C-alpha cells in the first residue's frame, strides 16, 4: 500500500501509544509532508516538559521518530502546497491539516497513483474522505 502518513500515526508508533495504526506494516511506500518532522519533534518536546521524561527516554523516542521519518518520502512545503492548502475545502480543516491534505492531493495528482491517507485525526479523515481518499487509522464517520 502507498500511504500518506500524518504525524498522529507516526507519533503513536514512535511513542508506543495505544491504538497505533494496525496497517503500518502494510505500507510499502510512505509519503509525508516535511511538516511531519516539526510536528513530531515539537510534540516530543512538549511531552518532555509536561511528563518530565528522563533524558534517556527522550533520546530513545527522538531516535525512533527520526528513524520512522527517514523511511518516508518527504514532500517539501512550497508555494504550490500553500496555495492549495489556502483554497476552500469541502469540510472544516485547520491550517496544518490543510497543508497535509494539500500535499496528499498534489502527490496523487502528480504521480497519478492512488494513495491511502493514514491519520488518527478525525477532521483530517473527514476532509480526506470528501476528496475521495481511502482513509485508515481514524474511525469511519
Feature roles, as predicted:
Residues 1-37, 47-60, 139-141:
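Short, well-structured N-terminal submotif of metal-dependent ribonuclease cores
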Residues 2, 33, 106-141:
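Acidic, PIN/NYN-like endoribonuclease modules and their adjacent C-terminal/linker elements
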Residues 5, 32, 76, 95-98, ...:
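Short beta-strand scaffold positions
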Residues 10, 36, 81, 100, ...:
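Alpha-helix capping/helix-boundary segments
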Residues 22, 32, 45-48, 55-57, ...:
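Anionic, Ser/Thr-rich low-complexity intrinsically disordered regions
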Residues 26-30, 87-93:
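A short glycine/serine-rich beta->alpha loop
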Residues 42-49, 105-106:
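Short glycine/serine- and small hydrophobic-enriched flexible loop segments
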Residues 67-91, 98-103:
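Acidic catalytic patch
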Amino acid at each position: 500500500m502507498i500511504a500518506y502518513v500524518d504525524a498522529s500515526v507516526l507519533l503513536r508508533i514512535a511513542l508506543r501509544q495505544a491504538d497505533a495504526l494496525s496497517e503500518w506494516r502494510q505500507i510499502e511506500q510512505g509519503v509525508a509532508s516535511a511538516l511531519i518532522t516539526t510536528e513530531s519533534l515539537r510534540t516530543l518536546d512538549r511531552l518532555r516538559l509536561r511528563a518530565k521524561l528522563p533524558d534517556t527516554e527522550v533520546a530513545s523516542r527522538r531516535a525512533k521518530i527520526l528513524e520512522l521519518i527517514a523511511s518516508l518520502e518527504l514532500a517539501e512545503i512550497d508555494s504550490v502546497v500553500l496555495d492549495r492548502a489556502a483554497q476552500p475545502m469541502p469540510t472544516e480543516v485547520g491550517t496544518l491539516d490543510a497543508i497535509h491534505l494539500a500535499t496528499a492531493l498534489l502527490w496523487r495528482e502528480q504521480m497519478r497513483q492512488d494513495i491511502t491517507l493514514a491519520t488518527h485525526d478525525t477532521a483530517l479523515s473527514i476532509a480526506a474522505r470528501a476528496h475521495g481518499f481511502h482513509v485508515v487509522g481514524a474511525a469511519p464517520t
